[in-house]
From Swiss-Prot:
Catalytic activity: N2 + 8 reduced [2Fe-2S]-[ferredoxin] + 16 ATP + 16 H2O = H2 + 8 oxidized [2Fe-2S]-[ferredoxin] + 2 NH4(+) + 16 ADP + 16 phosphate + 6 H(+)
Protein's organism: Dehalococcoides mccartyi (strain ATCC BAA-2266 / KCTC 15142 / 195)
Binding site for ATP: 8-15
Positions where ADP-ribosylarginine occurs in the chain: 97
Name under which the protein is recorded: Nitrogenase iron protein
HAMAP family: NifH (MF_00533)
EC number: 1.18.6.1
Length: 274
Protein backbone atom coordinates (compact mmCIF):
# COMPACT_ATOMS: atom_id res chain seq x y z
CA UNK A 1 0.00 0.00 0.00
CA UNK A 2 1.39 3.39 -1.00
CA UNK A 3 0.96 6.12 1.59
CA UNK A 4 0.71 9.56 -0.01
CA UNK A 5 0.37 13.02 1.56
CA UNK A 6 -0.68 16.06 -0.45
CA UNK A 7 0.56 19.37 0.95
CA UNK A 8 0.49 22.97 -0.30
CA UNK A 9 -0.51 26.52 0.53
CA UNK A 10 -4.07 27.08 1.76
CA UNK A 11 -6.42 27.78 -1.16
CA UNK A 12 -4.07 26.36 -3.80
CA UNK A 13 -6.54 23.60 -4.77
CA UNK A 14 -5.17 20.61 -2.84
CA UNK A 15 -8.54 19.06 -2.07
CA UNK A 16 -9.85 19.48 -5.62
CA UNK A 17 -6.61 18.13 -7.11
CA UNK A 18 -6.53 15.20 -4.67
CA UNK A 19 -10.14 14.16 -5.27
CA UNK A 20 -9.86 14.36 -9.06
CA UNK A 21 -6.59 12.39 -8.98
CA UNK A 22 -8.12 9.78 -6.68
CA UNK A 23 -11.17 9.51 -8.98
CA UNK A 24 -8.79 8.88 -11.91
CA UNK A 25 -6.90 6.23 -9.90
CA UNK A 26 -10.23 4.57 -9.03
CA UNK A 27 -11.11 4.59 -12.73
CA UNK A 28 -7.80 2.75 -13.30
CA UNK A 29 -8.98 0.06 -10.87
CA UNK A 30 -6.95 1.18 -7.86
CA UNK A 31 -8.46 0.86 -4.38
CA UNK A 32 -7.98 4.17 -2.56
CA UNK A 33 -8.67 5.54 0.92
CA UNK A 34 -8.76 9.34 1.34
CA UNK A 35 -8.16 10.81 4.80
CA UNK A 36 -9.04 14.50 4.99
CA UNK A 37 -6.76 16.24 7.48
CA UNK A 38 -8.44 19.63 7.43
CA UNK A 39 -10.94 21.10 9.94
CA UNK A 40 -13.01 22.38 6.96
CA UNK A 41 -13.76 18.71 6.19
CA UNK A 42 -13.99 19.26 2.42
CA UNK A 43 -11.41 16.69 1.32
CA UNK A 44 -13.96 14.06 0.26
CA UNK A 45 -17.05 16.12 -0.66
CA UNK A 46 -16.73 15.69 -4.45
CA UNK A 47 -16.12 11.95 -4.18
CA UNK A 48 -19.26 11.66 -2.04
CA UNK A 49 -21.50 13.69 -4.37
CA UNK A 50 -21.55 16.76 -2.14
CA UNK A 51 -22.27 14.91 1.09
CA UNK A 52 -20.84 16.80 4.06
CA UNK A 53 -19.43 13.78 5.82
CA UNK A 54 -19.55 13.44 9.60
CA UNK A 55 -16.02 13.89 10.88
CA UNK A 56 -14.13 11.59 13.22
CA UNK A 57 -13.86 14.28 15.90
CA UNK A 58 -17.56 15.24 15.73
CA UNK A 59 -18.47 11.56 15.97
CA UNK A 60 -16.19 11.07 18.98
CA UNK A 61 -17.75 14.12 20.68
CA UNK A 62 -21.28 12.80 20.10
CA UNK A 63 -20.81 9.05 20.50
CA UNK A 64 -17.98 8.90 23.01
CA UNK A 65 -15.24 6.30 22.53
CA UNK A 66 -17.64 3.63 21.26
CA UNK A 67 -17.49 4.42 17.54
CA UNK A 68 -18.29 2.08 14.66
CA UNK A 69 -16.15 2.29 11.51
CA UNK A 70 -19.25 2.76 9.31
CA UNK A 71 -20.01 6.04 11.09
CA UNK A 72 -16.75 7.66 10.01
CA UNK A 73 -15.77 5.86 6.78
CA UNK A 74 -18.02 6.28 3.73
CA UNK A 75 -17.79 4.83 0.23
CA UNK A 76 -17.56 7.33 -2.63
CA UNK A 77 -17.06 7.41 -6.40
CA UNK A 78 -15.35 4.32 -7.82
CA UNK A 79 -15.51 2.54 -4.44
CA UNK A 80 -13.09 5.00 -2.87
CA UNK A 81 -13.15 5.03 0.93
CA UNK A 82 -13.53 8.47 2.52
CA UNK A 83 -12.72 9.72 6.02
CA UNK A 84 -12.64 13.28 7.41
CA UNK A 85 -10.67 13.88 10.60
CA UNK A 86 -12.39 17.21 11.31
CA UNK A 87 -11.22 19.65 13.94
CA UNK A 88 -11.94 21.02 17.40
CA UNK A 89 -14.70 23.53 18.11
CA UNK A 90 -13.62 26.96 16.83
CA UNK A 91 -11.39 28.74 19.30
CA UNK A 92 -10.83 25.63 21.41
CA UNK A 93 -8.03 23.10 21.14
CA UNK A 94 -5.61 22.20 18.37
CA UNK A 95 -6.63 21.04 14.89
CA UNK A 96 -3.30 19.28 14.44
CA UNK A 97 -4.06 17.20 17.51
CA UNK A 98 -7.36 16.27 15.83
CA UNK A 99 -5.51 14.67 12.94
CA UNK A 100 -3.49 12.56 15.37
CA UNK A 101 -6.68 11.46 17.19
CA UNK A 102 -8.45 10.63 13.91
CA UNK A 103 -5.59 8.59 12.44
CA UNK A 104 -5.13 6.67 15.69
CA UNK A 105 -8.86 5.87 15.84
CA UNK A 106 -8.82 4.69 12.22
CA UNK A 107 -5.98 2.32 13.06
CA UNK A 108 -7.85 0.95 16.09
CA UNK A 109 -11.03 0.40 14.06
CA UNK A 110 -9.20 -1.30 11.19
CA UNK A 111 -10.04 1.62 8.91
CA UNK A 112 -7.03 0.95 6.71
CA UNK A 113 -8.34 -2.49 5.79
CA UNK A 114 -11.08 -3.30 3.29
CA UNK A 115 -12.54 -6.28 1.42
CA UNK A 116 -9.90 -5.89 -1.28
CA UNK A 117 -6.41 -4.71 -0.26
CA UNK A 118 -5.83 -0.96 -0.50
CA UNK A 119 -3.44 0.28 -3.18
CA UNK A 120 -3.25 3.83 -1.82
CA UNK A 121 -4.05 5.97 1.17
CA UNK A 122 -4.07 9.72 0.47
CA UNK A 123 -3.76 12.29 3.25
CA UNK A 124 -5.05 15.70 2.16
CA UNK A 125 -3.34 18.03 4.63
CA UNK A 126 -4.23 21.62 5.51
CA UNK A 127 -1.94 24.41 4.38
CA UNK A 128 1.70 24.82 5.20
CA UNK A 129 3.63 22.65 7.67
CA UNK A 130 3.36 25.25 10.40
CA UNK A 131 2.57 23.10 13.41
CA UNK A 132 3.57 19.64 14.52
CA UNK A 133 0.04 18.24 14.25
CA UNK A 134 -0.28 18.98 10.55
CA UNK A 135 3.17 17.51 10.00
CA UNK A 136 1.96 14.35 11.73
CA UNK A 137 1.38 12.24 8.58
CA UNK A 138 5.04 12.70 7.59
CA UNK A 139 6.47 12.85 11.09
CA UNK A 140 4.90 9.60 12.27
CA UNK A 141 5.61 7.73 9.04
CA UNK A 142 1.91 7.53 8.13
CA UNK A 143 2.82 8.96 4.74
CA UNK A 144 5.90 7.87 2.81
CA UNK A 145 5.60 9.97 -0.32
CA UNK A 146 4.66 13.65 -0.49
CA UNK A 147 3.40 15.69 -3.43
CA UNK A 148 3.24 19.47 -3.10
CA UNK A 149 0.56 21.40 -4.96
CA UNK A 150 1.84 24.82 -5.98
CA UNK A 151 1.55 27.47 -8.68
CA UNK A 152 3.75 30.21 -10.10
CA UNK A 153 2.58 32.65 -7.43
CA UNK A 154 5.27 33.72 -5.00
CA UNK A 155 3.48 32.64 -1.79
CA UNK A 156 2.62 29.22 -3.22
CA UNK A 157 6.29 28.68 -4.06
CA UNK A 158 7.36 30.03 -0.68
CA UNK A 159 5.01 27.54 1.03
CA UNK A 160 6.31 24.68 -1.16
CA UNK A 161 9.87 25.55 -0.17
CA UNK A 162 8.87 25.56 3.52
CA UNK A 163 7.18 22.18 3.16
CA UNK A 164 10.43 20.86 1.67
CA UNK A 165 12.18 22.01 4.85
CA UNK A 166 9.67 19.97 6.86
CA UNK A 167 10.19 16.88 4.68
CA UNK A 168 13.95 17.26 5.01
CA UNK A 169 13.63 17.48 8.79
CA UNK A 170 11.58 14.29 9.07
CA UNK A 171 13.32 12.32 6.28
CA UNK A 172 16.24 11.57 8.62
CA UNK A 173 13.93 10.00 11.19
CA UNK A 174 11.65 8.07 8.82
CA UNK A 175 11.12 6.97 5.25
CA UNK A 176 9.28 10.03 3.90
CA UNK A 177 10.37 11.34 0.49
CA UNK A 178 9.18 14.00 -1.95
CA UNK A 179 7.58 12.57 -5.10
CA UNK A 180 7.31 15.87 -6.95
CA UNK A 181 5.52 19.18 -7.41
CA UNK A 182 2.05 19.38 -8.95
CA UNK A 183 1.62 22.75 -10.63
CA UNK A 184 -2.04 23.79 -10.35
CA UNK A 185 -1.94 26.65 -12.82
CA UNK A 186 -2.91 30.20 -11.90
CA UNK A 187 -2.05 31.48 -15.39
CA UNK A 188 1.12 33.22 -14.17
CA UNK A 189 3.57 34.25 -16.92
CA UNK A 190 6.08 31.48 -17.78
CA UNK A 191 4.52 29.36 -15.02
CA UNK A 192 5.20 25.89 -16.43
CA UNK A 193 8.87 26.59 -17.19
CA UNK A 194 9.39 28.32 -13.83
CA UNK A 195 7.92 25.49 -11.73
CA UNK A 196 9.95 22.93 -13.72
CA UNK A 197 13.09 24.95 -12.89
CA UNK A 198 11.99 25.39 -9.24
CA UNK A 199 11.50 21.60 -8.98
CA UNK A 200 14.96 21.03 -10.48
CA UNK A 201 16.57 23.32 -7.91
CA UNK A 202 14.78 21.48 -5.11
CA UNK A 203 16.19 18.23 -6.53
CA UNK A 204 12.79 16.90 -7.59
CA UNK A 205 10.44 16.97 -10.62
CA UNK A 206 7.28 18.74 -11.70
CA UNK A 207 5.22 15.57 -11.92
CA UNK A 208 2.39 17.28 -13.82
CA UNK A 209 1.20 20.71 -14.92
CA UNK A 210 -2.57 21.02 -14.42
CA UNK A 211 -3.89 23.81 -16.67
CA UNK A 212 -6.61 26.16 -15.42
CA UNK A 213 -10.03 25.16 -16.73
CA UNK A 214 -13.52 26.31 -15.75
CA UNK A 215 -14.76 22.71 -16.02
CA UNK A 216 -13.26 22.19 -12.56
CA UNK A 217 -15.64 24.80 -11.11
CA UNK A 218 -18.56 23.51 -13.19
CA UNK A 219 -18.01 20.01 -11.82
CA UNK A 220 -17.75 21.38 -8.26
CA UNK A 221 -21.09 23.21 -8.64
CA UNK A 222 -22.51 19.79 -9.57
CA UNK A 223 -20.79 18.33 -6.47
CA UNK A 224 -18.64 15.99 -8.51
CA UNK A 225 -15.08 15.51 -9.69
CA UNK A 226 -14.46 16.34 -13.36
CA UNK A 227 -13.81 12.62 -13.93
CA UNK A 228 -17.37 11.77 -12.82
CA UNK A 229 -19.15 14.90 -14.11
CA UNK A 230 -17.76 14.82 -17.66
CA UNK A 231 -15.39 11.90 -18.33
CA UNK A 232 -14.79 13.18 -21.89
CA UNK A 233 -13.61 16.63 -20.75
CA UNK A 234 -10.06 17.67 -21.61
CA UNK A 235 -9.50 18.46 -17.94
CA UNK A 236 -10.49 14.90 -16.98
CA UNK A 237 -7.60 13.70 -19.16
CA UNK A 238 -5.23 16.06 -17.31
CA UNK A 239 -6.16 14.43 -14.00
CA UNK A 240 -5.81 10.98 -15.58
CA UNK A 241 -2.31 11.94 -16.74
CA UNK A 242 -1.46 13.13 -13.20
CA UNK A 243 -2.83 9.89 -11.71
CA UNK A 244 -0.74 7.80 -14.16
CA UNK A 245 2.36 9.88 -13.39
CA UNK A 246 1.91 9.24 -9.65
CA UNK A 247 1.12 5.55 -10.24
CA UNK A 248 4.31 5.10 -12.31
CA UNK A 249 6.54 7.45 -10.31
CA UNK A 250 9.99 6.14 -9.43
CA UNK A 251 11.61 9.43 -8.35
CA UNK A 252 11.54 9.92 -4.59
CA UNK A 253 14.02 12.33 -3.04
CA UNK A 254 14.94 14.20 0.11
CA UNK A 255 14.49 17.75 -1.23
CA UNK A 256 17.07 20.53 -0.97
CA UNK A 257 15.15 23.70 0.01
CA UNK A 258 16.47 26.93 -1.50
CA UNK A 259 17.05 30.27 0.23
CA UNK A 260 14.50 33.11 0.06
CA UNK A 261 17.02 35.12 -1.99
CA UNK A 262 17.32 32.28 -4.50
CA UNK A 263 13.54 31.97 -4.67
CA UNK A 264 13.19 35.69 -5.36
CA UNK A 265 15.90 35.62 -8.03
CA UNK A 266 14.01 32.74 -9.71
CA UNK A 267 10.84 34.87 -9.77
CA UNK A 268 12.83 37.76 -11.26
CA UNK A 269 14.45 35.46 -13.84
CA UNK A 270 11.03 34.34 -15.10
CA UNK A 271 9.56 37.84 -15.02
CA UNK A 272 7.07 37.30 -12.18
CA UNK A 273 8.58 40.10 -10.09
CA UNK A 274 10.74 42.92 -11.38
Amino acid sequence: MRKVAIYGKGGIGKSTTTQNTVAALAEMGRKVLVVGCDPKADSTRLLLGGLAQKTVLDTLREEGEDVELDLVRKTGFGNTLCVESGGPEPGVGCAGRGIITAVNLMEQLGGYESDSPLDYVFYDVLGDVVCGGFAMPIREGKAEEVYIVCSGEMMAMYAANNICKGIRKFADAGSVKLGGLICNSRMVDNEKEMIAEFAKRLGTQMIHFVPRDNDVQRAEINKKTVIEWNPQAKQADEYRALAKAIDNNQMFVVPKPISVDELESLLVEFGVIS
